[in-house]
Amino acid sequence: MEIPRQTEMVELVPNGKHLEGLLPVGVPTTDTQRTEDTQHCGEGKGFLQKSPSKEPHFTDFEGKTSFGMSVFNLSNAIMGSGILGLAYAMANTGIILFLFLLTAVALLSSYSIHLLLKSSGIVGIRAYEQLGYRAFGTPGKLAAALAITLQNIGAMSSYLYIIKSELPLVIQTFLNLEKPASVWYMDGNYLVILVSVTIILPLALMRQLGYLGYSSGFSLSCMVFFLIAVIYKKFQVPCPLAHNLANATGNFSHMVVAEEKAQLQGEPDTAAEAFCTPSYFTLNSQTAYTIPIMAFAFVCHPEVLPIYTELKDPSKRKMQHISNLSIAVMYVMYFLAALFGYLTFYDGVESELLHTYSKVDPFDVLILCVRVAVLIAVTLTVPIVLFPVRRAIQQMLFQNQEFSWLRHVLIATGLLTCINLLVIFAPNILGIFGIIGATSAPCLIFIFPAIFYFRIMPTDKEPARSTPKILALCFAAVGFLLMTMSLSFIIIDWVSGTSQHGGNH
């Protein structure tokens, strides 16, 4: 029997259900509900596999990526530059409020993945944009594709911004230079272009996400090393740093001498004690960035369905376990990195945690290794994040065309070119966290999964007033409220000029 070619969207069975691994698909379906023909969209064609040892079944086309590799892929899709901004978020919320918000965002992210998987199971669609088309037609598809594109361009921009800002510091440390030299290899703009062309682009040209699982595991190892270093440095970095206390007291001269005298005479340093006391609940103008930073840090939803498609022996339960495990691992890493980063610098922490360590010792070997690890991690993450953006472009512009390597290469090259231009002219990384986290992230996490589920789930199974659908609508309303509030506060912060964007370079 000839097996139909499949891409991100698999067969719709006649009764509208996603029968996991039970239904032969050789017979054409009779479902008249709205869907799009994606058999010519070559973006995903290379990773859907056939089982050679038995009759073709529904899941035989789904791929060969293992459970562990899928966890690596999804964890790496979650993990990114957002981890560097969480200590700054904690400094502007306090430990207790931060923990509450982080837990809420993690749980809501898991619930939204549940809605996505349930929706895809009903109609047999494995692409985020196609769920939008199935629910609302072309406007839904375009809205989903636009949100995915904006989110992932923002994510890749933040990754490349880290390369732009941190790689010159690494080279400066290796060359043992007190001040950056005015040469091309110390210019972050040249370096980010060089890394994009020599490392990121070749990885981005792969047609299978599964192969990137090995780089995913390596980059996750780099971030674990980053976390260990942050925890270790908490007990090595003195508090307060001389310049932090000087800023707090206005005494920019003789600060170290004054501290030493106070210690010798047994006098309490009230300024130091105040600076080095953690806050448990804080509200200020920068608190508006907290939820966008967290939302930005947990977005992985466009990658869930492609990873589900490539999963070996896929089922909704198995993919939900993968999602829950990935979110749980990232939740622990995020909280520990934020906590120990905050307890190291307190209110002196910058929006990019790693840059704050340059105030301690620019030539510290451990921090140098951490910088290298983070650079490797974000560099290897870019190709995974680029995949759904390219797929969205394929879905919008080249729906019914055969796969073309030329188009495949041109899309990746064009995307990286545009992102490099954004990074070269971007003033800071906090703006990327804030805007993307307050616009596309709430759409992808809260609003779209809920309204897609509400429209796709048949009313004969779940009436419009059923508890699951009411919860889904409430979920969408919460997302819209968070998006509106966060974006409003951020704009007010920009207009008032009170934003203190740490970590600029």
Curated annotation (Swiss-Prot):
Signal peptide: none
Pfam families xref list: Aa_trans (PF01490)
Keywords from the UniProt entry: Amino-acid transport, Antiport, Cell membrane, Disulfide bond, Glycoprotein, Ion transport, Membrane, Sodium, Sodium transport, Symport, Transmembrane, Transmembrane helix, Transport
The keyword Aminoacyl-tRNA synthetase belongs to this UniProt entry's keyword annotation: no
Record region (Disordered): 27-48
Transmembrane segments: 82-102, 105-125, 143-163, 186-206, 212-232, 288-308, 325-345, 367-387, 409-429, 432-452, 472-492
Disulfide linkage: C239-C276
Topology with respect to the bilayer: Multi-pass membrane protein
Catalytic reactions on record: L-histidine(out) + Na(+)(out) + H(+)(in) = L-histidine(in) + Na(+)(in) + H(+)(out); L-glutamine(out) + Na(+)(out) + H(+)(in) = L-glutamine(in) + Na(+)(in) + H(+)(out); L-asparagine(out) + Na(+)(out) + H(+)(in) = L-asparagine(in) + Na(+)(in) + H(+)(out)
Induction (free text): Up-regulated during renal ammoniagenesis and urinary ammonium excretion. Up-regulated during acute acidosis. Down-regulated by chronic treatment by insulin in hepatocytes. Up-regulated by acute treatment by insulin.
Function of the molecule: Symporter that cotransports specific neutral amino acids and sodium ions, coupled to an H(+) antiporter activity. Mainly participates in the glutamate-GABA-glutamine cycle in brain where it transports L-glutamine from astrocytes in the intercellular space for the replenishment of both neurotransmitters glutamate and gamma-aminobutyric acid (GABA) in neurons and also functions as the major influx transporter in ganglion cells mediating the uptake of glutamine. The transport activity is specific for L-glutamine, L-histidine and L-asparagine.
Family: Belongs to the amino acid/polyamine transporter 2 family.
Protein name in UniProt: Sodium-coupled neutral amino acid transporter 3
Organism: Mus musculus (Mouse)
Lineage, uppermost ranks: Eukaryota, Metazoa, Chordata, Craniata, Vertebrata
